[in-house]
Amino acid sequence: MRTTAYLLPLAVLFATALPGCYYDNEEELYPNSFCDTVNVTYSGSISKIIESKCATPGCHVAGGTGTGNFTVFSELKEQVDNGRLLPSVRREAEAVPMPPDGALRACEVRQLELWVAAGALDN
C-alpha cells in the first residue's frame, strides 16, 4: 500500500508534465502558408508555377497535348492574351479545367491573376 501511495502521485506528475514538453512548430505544420502577392514576377513566381504544373511532360511542352508550349514565353502569353489561361486555372464552368490532375493552390491562382492584371510581363 505504501508503494502505491508513492507511485500514484509520481505517475500523475509524469502524466501531466510530459505532454507539456511537446510543442507545435507552425513552419513544420504549415510549410507553404506564406503567399507572396506583392512581388509577383514571371521569373520569381509565375515560371515556377508554369514549370511545375503546366509545362510538364506530355502537356504544355513541345510535342505535348496541351494548347501551346509554355516553355516558350510567347506561347504562354498568347494564352493569357486570348483570355484562356485564367478561366482554366480558376476552373470556371465554361473553361477546360487546368491542370487536369487537380486544382492549383489558391495562392498560385492569385499570383497568376496579379501577374495577368499587371500585363503578364516577361520580368
Predicted regions and their residues:
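Aromatic- and Gly/Pro-enriched helix-to-coil junctions and flexible linker segments
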Residues: 21-123
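Sec-dependent bacterial lipoprotein signal peptides
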Residues: 1-21
